[in-house]
Curated annotation (Swiss-Prot):
Native species: Endomicrobium trichonymphae
Induction: By stress conditions e.g. heat shock.
Biased composition (Basic and acidic residues): 606-621
Domain of life assignment: Bacteria
Family matches, as InterPro entries: ATPase_NBD, Chaperone_DnaK, Heat_shock_70_CS, HSP70_C_sf, HSP70_peptide-bd_sf, Hsp_70_fam
Residue ranges with Polar residues bias: 583-605
Name of the protein: Chaperone protein DnaK
SUPFAM superfamilies per UniProt: Actin-like ATPase domain (SSF53067), Heat shock protein 70kD (HSP70), C-terminal subdomain (SSF100934), Heat shock protein 70kD (HSP70), peptide-binding domain (SSF100920)
Family: Belongs to the heat shock protein 70 family.
């Protein structure tokens, strides 16, 4: 069976893994180890000439191309937000698809086979729109998303794969670049992983810490120099890199230096930023962000009907959990030491790879029981939200409830599907609406309308409404304003393919340019050394062809460059013959000279030859 890879599609960095021979293996990016370890930085960039850069190449040029570089777009998944770059608009799904395409390509190179399927992780607190947007991104990238797995659940799988047989209640504290998830899991002795509860915040993460650092550094510089660096996009990008680097370094040391020479300039000349930055300063800046995690921990423990004392293990997931202040906060608040034998940056993609292996049948002793993070319901009379599937219900799940009309002879009902915890419909997220019409005239309260909510293993919802009197039925697979239509997906797939074909064209252009440039150099050198050995007419033709080739290189038309290169090759044939003959004469003279000198010719004759030899043990008879 074809391999299914596991992907952690992250806000700051993404990662991929596969299970082979019973072990999970990290799939490296083509660029190797970077600031984010072996991961794929979640950066997409468009250069001024329209070239697409993804991952580490995009991150590396962010300082010099801030307007063309985009990251942290995961925070906008499931919204109508559009990113504008070089006059074009891109949805978060498209940008995520570029990352997934890069992962797909590098995975295929690493594994040596075509990859068409993936398990992708999402924050546990992602709503239906955000989950559907993630599946759409996979489709654009040419990947069938066979399962969406909540990130904390994936981390638990990675932790527990070699601990099946032990009953444990695990609190997964997942603080990533852009989101917070707290999940309580019960690991059964038989290999079951059941999610008891989940809570979180999709707008809380390491990016908020970076922003706090950037503001602090910018304010400090402003006090000294009277210049606000936040008004300069290139300076902000340099600050962003410096803040992230300092945050990472201060997880291991107590003090670091931030040095940004030539950060800006004014009438007095260039300005340099140099400051010492301590762990204590960092912790004071981010403490209020870390404290915001408290409510989600308490909510998850409460929903699981547990107390902090009954939690067996704490697993820390996500880059920011490497920070001592975050580790201490989680351990102090729960009253347990965190599990150290798991890499917070890699465990989510490892867990996704485990789930992929479960789906292919390579792993048979694990059963994953996940939950829906938010309550699902519909709007009823008076604008009230009536719930059908409560939050933290194990998925897949199916619930039905009978409703009726609110007015006499009402011919139709509108089903407004809601997601959220608020009592009033208007305060929750509307996932979609549909009409059930053709209801026969009857007094209010008499018709029986059965509404069924069916949520699949990916957490994606299907809703149907049936008039039990007539048997008439309508259904909807949630298609809110933020979900991409099939046409949208097809369009974006073509755009993604277009970028891939443009890369091929660009590579071809570079190769042709290099060939032409090398030929021009070679012909010019030969003309300088041996030009007097060809006729004036032949020399003129060569010089004209050289000029034409140089002019062609000034443009970008590959066909013109190819044609000029071929013309120069033809024109320089006579010159090549002269050079070849001169070389032969030189070799003949050298051979004659060598014969008169004895032993040195022996060395010259053998130079460049390979002689196979056998090692002989002289002591052996």
């Amino acid at each position: 069976m074809a391999k299914i890879i596991g992907i952690d599609l992250g806000t700051s960095n993404s990662a991929a893994a596969v299970m082979e021979g019973g072990k999970t293996t990290l799939i490296p990016s083509a660029e190797g180890t970077t600031l984010g370890g072996k991961a794929f930085p979640s950066y997409v960039a468009f250069t001024k000439d329209g070239q697409l850069l993804v991952g580490e190449p995009a991150r590396r040029q962010a300082v010099t191309n801030p307007e063309g570089t985009i990251n942290a777009f995961k925070r906008k998944m499931g919204t109508n937000y559009k990113y504008k770059v070089n006059g074009k608009e891109f949805t978060p799904q498209q940008l995520s698809a570029f990352i997934l395409q890069k992962i797909k390509k590098d995975s295929e190179a690493y594994l040596g086979e075509t990859i068409t399927k993936a398990v992708i992780t999402v924050p546990a607190y992602f709503n239906d729109d955000q989950r559907q947007a993630t599946k759409d991104a996979g489709a654009i990238a040419g990947l069938e998303v066979v399962r969406l797995v909540n990130e904390p659940t994936a981390a638990s799988l990675a932790y527990g794969i070699d601990k099946v047989g032990k009953e444990q209640k695990i609190l997964v504290f997942d603080l990533g670049g852009g989101t917070l998830d707290v999940t309580i899991m019960e690991m059964g002795a038989e290999g079951t992983f059941e999610v008891l509860s989940t809570s979180g915040d999709t707008q809380l993460g390491g990016t908020d810490m970076d922003n706090a650092l950037i503001d602090y550094i910018a304010e400090d510089f402003k006090k000294t120099n009277g210049i606000d660096l936040r008004n300069d996009k290139m300076a902000v990008q340099r600050l962003k890199e410096a803040a992230e680097k300092a945050k990472i370094e201060l997880s291991n040391v107590l003090e670091t230096d931030i040095n940004l020479p030539f950060i800006t300039a004014d009438a007095s000349g260039p300005k340099h930023l140099a400051m010492k930055f301590t762990r204590a300063t960092l912790e004071n800046l981010v403490r209020h962000i870390v404290e915001r995690c408290k409510a989600s921990i308490d909510q998850a423990v409460k929903d699981a009907k547990l107390t902090a004392e009954t939690v067996t293990k704490i697993i820390l997931v996500g880059g920011p959990t490497r920070m001592p202040i975050v580790q201490k906060f989680a351990e102090d608040h729960v009253g347990k030491k965190a599990e150290r034998g798991i890499d917070p940056m890699e465990c989510v993609c490892f867990g996704a790879a485990v789930q992929a292996a479960v789906l292919t049948g390579d792993v048979k002793d694990i059963l994953l029981l996940d939950v829906t993070p938010l309550t699902l319901g519909l709007e009823t009379m008076g604008g009230v939200r009536t719930s059908l599937i409560d939050r933290n219900t194990t998925v897949p799940a199916k619930r039905s409830q009978v409703f009726s009309t609110a007015a006499d002879n009402q011919p139709s009902v509108e089903i407004n599907v809601l997601q959220g915890e608020r009592a009033m419909a208007k305060d929750n997220l509307s996932l979609g609406r549909f009409m059930l019409d053709g209801i026969p005239p009857a007094p209010r309260g008499v018709p029986q309308i059965e509404v069924t909510f069916d949520i699949d293993a990916n957490g994606i919802l299907h809703v149907s409404a049936k008039d039990k009197g007539t048997g008439k039925e309508q259904s909807i697979k949630i298609s809110s304003s933020t979900k991409l239509s099939k046409d949208d997906i097809d369009k974006y797939v073509k755009e993604a393919e277009q970028y891939a074909s443009e890369d091929v064209k660009r590579k071809e252009e570079i190769e042709v340019r290099n060939e032409a440039d090398n030929l021009i150099y070679s012909v010019e050198k030969s003309l300088k050394d041996h030009g007097d050995k060809v006729s004036a007419d032949e020399r003129l033709i060569i010089e004209q062809s050289l000029t034409a080739a140089k002019d062609a290189l000034k443009g970008s038309d590959v066909a013109t460059i190819k044609s000029a290169k071929e013309a120069l090759t033809t024109a320089s044939h006579k010159l090549a013959e002269v050079v070849y003959k001169a070389s032969q004469v030189q070799d003949t003279q050298g051979a004659a000279q060598g014969q008169s000198q004895g032993n040195p010719q022996q060395t010259a004759d053998n130079r460049g030859k390979v002689v196979d030899a056998e090692i002989v043990d002289e002591n052996k008879e």
